[in-house]
């Protein structure tokens, strides 16, 4: 006779085992109709699963994030149902939930066309209208193998055969279509109303370029048509803000086939990069970091000692010379330990903070490369802090302050924080994990910050905090991190002399704020739609004359501003002033100076902004003061 405890603390007693749906029915027909799944003692389950003992139960509906995830997962299976009806020879692979949607990987001889996508979506809508029940059946591995063997589904068979023999498998049945999944899924297709298929792309089976190329159908699903429309609107805006598109308009950078995943920085894009780098350099110096530089090509033996060779060999670019094998560094940390290891260190020397703008290369799959957001060659704002166990909390606390200081400078006030704790497989004693996790959580709590706990999501060598930015479209970008490492310093022989004159291994804190310069610049371009804050703008001022008579004055003004290190360009083309103003506005130049005969005679300059605000005429020194004020605002000038 289970006693069910509800989220509000109320309890309900049942005379026999009860399903989640029956609990919902006991609370009212409206809730039962809306029920999609349930959490039983924190575990997300199908509504048909019986509850046999006292439990805490939360009914999940489309208003909950868990409900939306369940709906999206069910839509992935609905793709399978529709595709198998329309294209019986198709073979189904996998169909997981992703951010804002879902996809299904399918093997089919003919490429799916836009018309095929329309037909699949139409068939899905027809199936939804049937309001049929989605039934779940728990089977053994052998039974699942036979089921998919009967259906001639080789990809499903491959997955089934890799599942441990004693593990249960759930089969979900959509009428004549059967799929497998951990679940949960909606109990009836009446919950599957608001969706849209988005596109088709290629994807290798299991991400292995040596395996079959499949077709991936992407879709999105939401709890209401209003949410779907808002999402599609955001996508439309995101397309306008695509950093690759804006980079082409502004001549910031380009990529090309001869160097996949490598950036060709143009002068204007490189100007943004240099401002960013110098700002981080100066800020780190104020926070007592030492800037260092380490080799890019390092002997294989160091990567073997650090453990990277075993775990990341396939992601490394390697080369040989004089019968020695080298790797181009995919990360900086082992090299930073080498610098720490030079000379005897005392506890009095700690903490030591080593920072590097380290150029790294990783052999990312070509299909995953995406402008600045996913590259092979990137530069990290990387630093490593070597400290004692007792110093961890203080160093984390200082880093949190630094993170928020820098993010605010770029106009990001919404920062999401996650703390990842010990996984099952790990190094280090429970005692040191307890201390480290407490140090991280206490540092966050002392700042009064809200954060989410991710149990078991830490690396094997230590817990970590992740910092994610929310941009103007509500998209979340994970950028900053601080990671405790108990393993690498010991593996690479790092030590210091403690107060008791004994050798101790320091704790190593891996930390980054931007993540990589390339990706962060991509985020900034999209966040600001290319209209960078004045301090970051590749060209801060464009000077233009109305007639050829004003050319010399324009050049003089440009020289004066350039001498003061403002990024200035002069436009002396024989074009109408309206054309020039429009062109530099489209180039997102923050300030436009216009000089005609009137300004030339008065010694003043006419000033307007890219947003169209007209300041009228003013002395050049007054404009410089205006420019300085705008630069000092940094990211606080807002997003337009």
Curated annotation (Swiss-Prot):
UniProt xrefs under HAMAP family: Thr_tRNA_synth
NCBIfam families membership: thrS (TIGR00418)
Segments of this protein annotated with the region Catalytic: 242-533
Gene (name only): thrS
Lineage: Bacteria, Bacillati, Cyanobacteriota, Cyanophyceae, Synechococcales
Family (UniProt): Belongs to the class-II aminoacyl-tRNA synthetase family.
PANTHER family on file: THREONINE--TRNA LIGASE, CHLOROPLASTIC_MITOCHONDRIAL 2, THREONINE-TRNA LIGASE
Alphabetical UniProt keywords: Aminoacyl-tRNA synthetase, ATP-binding, Cytoplasm, Ligase, Metal-binding, Nucleotide-binding, Protein biosynthesis, RNA-binding, tRNA-binding, Zinc
Coiled coil: none
Origin: domain of life: Bacteria
Enzyme Commission code: 6.1.1.3
GO molecular-function term, one example from the UniProt record: tRNA binding
Subunit structure as annotated in this protein's UniProt entry: Homodimer.
Function: Catalyzes the attachment of threonine to tRNA(Thr) in a two-step reaction: L-threonine is first activated by ATP to form Thr-AMP and then transferred to the acceptor end of tRNA(Thr). Also edits incorrectly charged L-seryl-tRNA(Thr).
InterPro entries tied to this protein: aa-tRNA-synt_IIb, aa-tRNA-synth_II, aa-tRNA-synth_II/BPL/LPL, Anticodon-bd, Anticodon-bd_dom_sf, Beta-grasp_dom_sf, TGS, TGS-like
GO BP annotations, alphabetical order: threonyl-tRNA aminoacylation
Domain TGS per the UniProt entry, residue ranges: 1-61
Major localization class: cytoplasm
Reaction equation(s) it catalyzes: tRNA(Thr) + L-threonine + ATP = L-threonyl-tRNA(Thr) + AMP + diphosphate + H(+)
Protein's name in the database: Threonine--tRNA ligase
Annotated Zn(2+) binding sites: 333, 384, 510
């Amino acid at each position: 006779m289970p006693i069910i405890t509800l989220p509000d603390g109320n309890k309900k007693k049942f005379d026999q085992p009860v399903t989640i749906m029956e609990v919902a029915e006991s609370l009212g027909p409206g809730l039962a109709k809306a029920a999609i799944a349930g959490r039983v003692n924190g575990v997300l389950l199908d509504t048909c699963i019986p509850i046999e003992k006292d439990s805490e139960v939360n009914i999940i509906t489309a208003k909950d994030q868990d409900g939306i995830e369940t709906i999206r997962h069910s839509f992935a299976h609905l793709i399978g149902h529709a595709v198998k009806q329309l294209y019986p020879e198709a073979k189904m692979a996998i169909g997981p939930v992703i951010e804002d949607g879902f996809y299904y990987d399918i093997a089919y001889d003919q490429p799916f066309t836009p018309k095929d996508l329309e037909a699949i979506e139409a068939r899905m809508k027809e199936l939804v209208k049937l309001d049929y029940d989605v039934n779940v059946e728990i089977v053994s591995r052998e039974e699942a193998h036979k089921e998919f063997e009967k259906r001639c589904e080789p990809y499903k068979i491959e997955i089934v055969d890799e599942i441990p023999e004693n593990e249960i498998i759930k089969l979900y049945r959509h009428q004549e279509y059967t799929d497998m999944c951990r679940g949960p899924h909606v109990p009836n297709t009446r919950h599957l109303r608001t969706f849209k298929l988005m596109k088709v792309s290629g994807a290798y089976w299991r991400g292995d370029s040596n395996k079959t190329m499949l077709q991936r159908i992407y879709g999105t699903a939401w709890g209401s048509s209003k949410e779907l429309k808002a999402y599609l609107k955001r996508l439309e805006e995101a397309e306008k803000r695509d950093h690759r598109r804006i980079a082409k308009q502004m001549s910031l950078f380009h990529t090309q086939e001869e160097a996949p995943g490598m950036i060709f920085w143009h002068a204007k894009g490189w100007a943004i990069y240099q401002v960013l780098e110098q700002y981080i350099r100066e800020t780190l110096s104020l926070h007592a970091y030492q800037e260092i530089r380490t080799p890019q090509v390092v002997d294989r033996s160091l990567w073997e000692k650090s453990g990277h060779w075993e775990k990341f060999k396939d992601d490394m670019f390697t080369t040989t010379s004089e019968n020695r094998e080298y790797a181009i560094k995919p990360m900086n940390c082992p090299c930073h330990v080498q610098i720490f290891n030079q000379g005897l260190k005392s506890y009095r020397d700690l903490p030591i903070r080593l920072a590097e703008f380290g150029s790294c290369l990783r052999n990312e799959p070509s299909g995953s490369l995406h402008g600045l957001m996913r590259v092979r060659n990137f530069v990290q704002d990387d630093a490593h802090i070597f400290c004692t166990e007792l110093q961890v909390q203080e160093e984390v606390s200082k880093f949190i302050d630094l993170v928020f200081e820098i993010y605010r400078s770029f106009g990001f006030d919404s920062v999401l924080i996650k703390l990842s704790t010990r996984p099952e497989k790990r190094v280090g004693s429970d005692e040191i994990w307890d201390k480290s996790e407490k140090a991280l959580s206490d540092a966050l709590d002392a700042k009064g910050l809200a954060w989410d706990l991710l149990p078991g999501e830490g690396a094997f060598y230590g817990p970590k905090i992740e910092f994610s930015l929310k941009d103007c479209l509500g998209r979340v970008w994970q950028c900053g991190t601080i990671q405790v490492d108990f393993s690498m310093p010991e593996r690479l022989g790092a030590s210091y002399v403690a107060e008791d004159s004994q050798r101790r291994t320091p704790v190593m804190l891996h930390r980054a704020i931007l993540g990589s310069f390339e990706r962060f610049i991509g985020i900034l371009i999209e966040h600001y739609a290319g209209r960078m804050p004045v301090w970051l703008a590749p060209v801060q001022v464009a000077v233009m004359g109305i007639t050829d008579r004003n050319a010399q004055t324009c050049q003089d003004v440009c020289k004066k501003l350039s001498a003061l290190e403002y990024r200035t360009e002069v436009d002396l083309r024989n074009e109408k002033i309206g054309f020039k103003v429009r062109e530099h506005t489209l180039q997102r130049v923050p300030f436009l100076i216009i000089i005609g005969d009137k300004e030339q005679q008065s010694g003043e300059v006419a000033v307007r902004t890219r947003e169209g605000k007209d300041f009228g005429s003013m002395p050049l020194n007054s404009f410089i003061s205006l420019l300085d004020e705008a630069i000092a605002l940094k990211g606080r000038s807002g997003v337009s």
